[in-house]
Amino acid sequence: MMSVRPKTSQTYGHQDHRFCPTCGGPLEDGHESGFLVCKSCGRISYLDPKLAGAAMIEINDKLLLVRRGIQPAYGKWSFPSGYVNRGEQIERAVEREVVEETGLVVTADWLVGLYSEPDKTVVLAVYSATVTGGKLIAGDETLETDTFPYTQLPDLAFNGDAKIVEDWLGGRAKR
């Protein structure tokens, strides 16, 4: 089962915070906490992590993966995933991201785990999910979708992806 969309160029880049989100004043080093502080209003700019969600989806005894159409890891295989919007329930965010990236409607069933790495800005909540509808496509942020046998996965996009697969398979075996 495979779906492909046309190639499009994507750009990506992180910008350092340079201005205060409260007053627009310049941020500078020097606060005792190690974080940036606004020179104008004194607000400390904490660089809190961003929450993302991902789905582990089984289709015909295979794992659904998406080939990423955005950075980071453009062109690499990973799980349908994306950021949780402010005020959004994590499970609903996972379900929304799956629809956006694959066209499939899913229900987030159980939490596989929470994953983070030192010096990374993202905390990833991974759920096992069941397909309840939709049609498999490659969404706007996805180059293609495909299913793979668990023992024959392609090279995965991120360092922690293999551990996530291992945890998911272990969790499935216990259910």
Residue spans of the language-model regions?
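Conserved N-terminal beta-strand and adjoining loop/helix that marks the start
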Residues: 36-64, 83
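A short coil-to-beta-strand element that immediately follows conserved catalytic motifs
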Residues: 28-30, 104-113
